[in-house]
Amino acid sequence: MPHEMEENGAEVSDVMSENEDDTETFLKDDEKMTEQSTTDSTTEVKKKYDPKDPLRPRRKKARRACFACQRAHLTCGDERPCQRCIKRGLADACQDGVRKKAKYLHDAPPEALRPVLGPNYNPTPTPSRTNGHRHSSSQSDNLSATGSNFFSQGSTASLPVYSAGAQTPVAIDGLPSFNPQTSPTSFQGPINNAAHTPMNNMMPAGNMDFNALFDPSNPALYNFDLEGLNFGSQYAGWEFGILNKMALGAETPPRENSMSQTPTTEANYAALFGNANNGFDHPMLGADFSGMDQNNQSLYAQGNLQHGLPHAYAIAAGPTSLASPSTDTTASPHSVAGMDGSPNHNFAGIPTVPAATRPRPKHNKAGPKSILGKRQRDSAAIYESVKEPYPYTTGFHNMVAVLRNRLPGNKLLRIAKALGEIRPSFISCTKDLTRQDLVFMEKCFQRTLVEYDDFLQHCCAPTIVCRRSGEVAAVNKEFTALTGWTKDVLLGKEPNLNVNVYSGRSTNGTNTPDHNSQGEMTTPRPQRAMLDLSGGRPQPVFLGELLDDDSVVEFYQDFSQLAFEDSRGKVQRSCRLNKYRAPQDPDQKEPGSQKDAQPGILSSRVTRIDGSHGISRIEKDGKVECTYCWTIKRDVFDIPMMIIINFLPRYLPDQGPQQLAV
């Protein structure tokens, strides 16, 4: 036994134990205990270590010393009763000592400052004793004598309710039953205070004391095991639990009234104890609380201060509402107990202060929207809606038909040569894929497109997302402002009436149109019979229709290099984008003349920028000089899935910054 005390003993948890006199006292006391408890015939000489020797074995620190060891400034252990009290015959009176509170913890209730119960904690209940010489503040011995039912220790001690006067232990024998016909946060208290029925639907099985319900360090409040986390400090475990609760609460899509829909298997303490507007009603308190507030002293009254509710919350003692702490004058309108308009319950004798009423927003029938402004999306809807694979073969045929009707023969031959290099690789990658694989490939594309929609909303550069066949799948507003191509036209939801294209079969070898040929004509579209093969889905605009001739050739030459050879590469080049020009109705007036006729509120410079998106100065011959950078996103089969392209407009070669409107 002495060797176990020397090896497994704990260091003194008080500051006074570091002195040399205390160490000598401990050595003398240890020698006396050794003489009294030694019964073996074989005596071993115990090696004594110099207290000043830095190489002496260090003792293990105790979490908290008992009251007897704390008074004697001796080493104590984590177990209760400790070994020293057992040897001294003080096992029945061994309990945790009371430490002096720090100033910033003066308002914290004692049960919130309870130490974390370690694995060596002995849950044996010991009778609490009263000490007349101890001060009658919130530091009471019987608080830490036994663990509450929340920590599964089996103890049923009645903890006191603290007021400005003496300590008066009050226990709850029963609480009114919960009416399942009403809302989850509404309660009906009995008329007769003497008759009580157990609260089976609200509380878990087992006896429960009053202060334990108010205990903010209770792990059941946030459904995590504080003891099992094995934190050295309760505050670290409490912080970890709150962060864990926040992480588990971040769901997509958000559930409506998720805070008020508490499972019936857990204790709904948040509905029991609300803010200043949602406390107890007097009939609900029962006969045990009838004389508690005779002098208009609230539950948390300290000294001469009278509090309806605490004005601030100390560490590990937070408000019962998950919203910000509320005071008497500013009550939170989002308290958990009052989310669905439940009736207000108040303590007897405590005046209520009306909270600032705010208009409650109307909920959309489509579903609740997130408070943080995130767009609600459901991945399950994407997986259920995609039933057929995407016809990429038809898409490539339509792309070739568009390029064949537009480009001259020499440039079309260069594009065909570039596509011929990657065609065998596409065939070898897709020949072993089944129909289910192709459907899954399309689901991956649609799910990835949802993520890129958020990216497009926050990207300030003009950006488009295309399939590997060149069909536009997503676009942001900046690209529309730069080129004039609207989103509905690019995605095929509206007809493409662009007249800013020309047939290149009889061109003079440059990017300028040959006026001796057909001249301006609408964008050549594939035949209707070919479009019907796609199942009647809208035909988006191809990337080849947005770029000029030379830029299209350069793009597909770069695409042949990045498709399979350089999987992580990117391309940065100069290009020219075709502006969208719809045929104007002769009866329709010029938009500029209408704007000039109206009295403008903005200045002339801002009006010019707003009228032409600030792009008219960098446009030449219906084209916009740009620098673009693009990369390839691959699917789970390592096949090019989508192409993400960013554009930035740039100056013309003979243009200065002063000539720009932006």
From Swiss-Prot:
Residues 121-130, 137-149 have a biased composition (Polar residues). The keyword Transcription applies. Keywords: Activator, DNA-binding, Gluconeogenesis, Metal-binding, Nucleus, Transcription, Transcription regulation, Zinc. GO terms for molecular function: DNA-binding transcription factor activity, RNA polymerase II-specific; RNA polymerase II transcription regulatory region sequence-specific DNA binding; zinc ion binding. GO terms for cellular component: nucleus. InterPro entries: ERT1_acuK_gluconeogen_tf, PAS_13, Zn2-C6_fun-type_DNA-bd_sf, Zn2Cys6_DnaBD. Residues 1-61, 105-149, 502-524, 580-606 are annotated as: Disordered. It comes from Fusarium vanettenii (strain ATCC MYA-4622 / CBS 123669 / FGSC 9596 / NRRL 45880 / 77-13-4) (Fusarium solani subsp. pisi). Transcription factor which regulates nonfermentable carbon utilization. Activator of gluconeogenetic genes. SUPFAM superfamilies: Zn2/Cys6 DNA-binding domain. This is Transcription activator of gluconeogenesis NECHADRAFT_59099. Residues 25-34, 43-56, 582-593 have a biased composition (Basic and acidic residues). Belongs to the ERT1/acuK family. The keyword DNA-binding applies. Residues 448-519 form the PAS domain. It is found in: Nucleus. GO terms for biological process: cellular response to starvation; gluconeogenesis. Residues 66-94 bind DNA.
